[in-house]
Regions:
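N-terminal "arm"/small-domain region of PLP-dependent enzymes with the aminotransferase-like
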Residues: 1-31, 351
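Phosphate-binding glycine-rich loop
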Residues: 33-77, 91-94, 101-103, 170
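PLP-dependent aminotransferase class I/II
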Residues: 35-42, 47-53, 114, 118, ...
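A short hydrophobic/small-residue beta-strand
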Residues: 78-79, 92, 99, 155, ...
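Conserved coil-to-alpha-helix start sites within the AMP-binding
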Residues: 84-89
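Helix C-cap/helix->beta junction micro-motif
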Residues: 95, 150-151, 309
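Short beta-strand->loop structural element characteristic of the AMP-binding/adenylate-forming
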Residues: 98-108, 314
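Active-site phosphate-binding strand-loop segment of PLP-dependent enzymes
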Residues: 107-191, 196-198, 203, 298
């Protein structure tokens, strides 16, 4: 008999979500407006401690609006971290921009500041730069922001995987001109599907809200002076989010405990888990391991072995510059071998579901140990 499925990451309800969802039904506010949407935005804004929050239908919608607000137009270059999910880069192309993909640094696997400098020297100042906090680990934000400030580059902070992560005492999602959050079903909290845009300036937040509601002008008839989108979050989904916010810090603690158990149980094996830099708290959304070169075991073998036990694991994100859809885009690296390519070749994402018990995690570790 097949054992109970152990997921990579799945929705984990806290218990109070239904109360907020029932509120939407009781008041008949089922549309993408209402008390839950407003309340969820306020909860997020209070938690982040900075910025103006607009709840949206997806993290991708938030990224698209950020690219719009940055003024990206056809032919504009936008620098983007290559080691990420495709949603980080797709909105650049939505607006006719040209992605220039940048390599990672080996410490956090995030955007390499030296590569940013090399890209500026090669291509000039971009219209914007998209930096990602991979698997919840904050990137080298001080260096990246310093470069952006020095060259007048708009920073879009893709914190889709990093809600609850903290860099030098400041919450991730609040460092850029625009910050992006995701509440997809696999994220640290979920609204089923959803995202949020964090704007530094209130005027930008108001403009984002306008674009997210079809860019309708405030007149008696339907009038539009710019393109808009149907990107607003449902009041029902926002109700789930309000309940999830009540357990966010608990989920961060659980994710970090999962990472620590992997660190202890897999000690001595030829693999490495990324360490937190000083004065950084990762939410450890997914624990990812980097296998030693020539260790005799591949990520694919680990994934296949775990799958035999009904356990889900996955490869690291395939870098964007290796994706067929972006084959004509430039890629910049400073190391002889691309860090992003190396991490993709040797990395594996381990089950990090907050509903996974310590006993189930011990089973995961036993399967992995059995391969070495």
């Amino acid at each position: 008999m097949m054992s109970e499925r152990i997921f990579l990451a799945s929705p984990h309800m806290g218990g109070s979500e239904r109360r907020y969802v029932d509120l939407a039904f009781d008041t008949n506010w089922i549309a993408p407006l209402g008390a839950n949407v407003t309340g969820f935005e306020q909860d997020l804004q209070q938690y982040l401690g900075a910025g103006y929050v607009t709840a949206l239908s997806a993290g991708t919608a938030a990224l698209h609006l950020a690219v719009r607000l940055a003024g990206v137009q056809r032919g504009d270059r936008v620098f983007c971290q290559s080691l990420t999910f495709s949603a980080s880069a797709n909105p650049i192309v939505y607006e006719g921009g040209e992605p220039v993909f940048l390599d990672s640094e080996p410490d956090t696997w995030n955007l390499d500041p030296e590569t940013v400098e090399a890209a500026i020297a090669r291509f000039g100042v971009p219209k914007a730069l998209i930096a990602v906090h991979l698997y919840g680990m904050p990137g080298k934000l001080d260096a990246i922001r310093s470069l952006c400030d020095a060259h007048g580059i708009l920073l879009i902070e893709d914190a889709a995987e990093a809600l609850g992560s903290v860099y030098h005492g400041q919450k991730c999602g609040t460092f850029g001109h625009y910050g992006v959050l995701s509440f997809n079903g696999n994220k640290i909290i979920t609204t089923s599907g959803g995202g949020a845009l964090v704007c530094r300036d209130e005027a930008d937040a108001q403009h984002a809200l306008k674009m997210a509601t079809q860019a309708r002008e405030p007149v008696a008839w339907y009038e539009h002076t710019e393109l808009g989108y149907n990107y607003r979050m449902s009041n029902i989904c926002a109700g789930i989010g309000r309940g999830q916010m009540e357990v966010l810090e608990q989920r961060v603690g659980q994710k970090r405990a999962i990472h620590d158990r992997y660190r202890d149980a897999l000690a001595g094996l030829p693999l490495q888990l990324p360490a937190e830099p000083e004065d950084v708290r990762s939410n450890r959304w997914l624990t990812a391991a980097l296998l030693a070169p020539d260790c005799g075991v591949t990520p694919g073998q680990i994934i296949a072995a775990l799958a035999e036990h009904n356990i889900e694991a996955r490869h690291i994100w395939k870098p964007m510059h290796l994706q067929p859809v972006f084959r004509d885009c430039a890629f910049v690296k400073t190391a002889e071998r691309s860090v992003a390519e190396d991490v993709f070749a040797r990395g594996v994402c381990l089950p990090s579901d907050t509903k996974m018990t310590p006993e189930q995690q011990a089973q995961v570790c036993a399967v992995i140990r059995g391969l070495f």
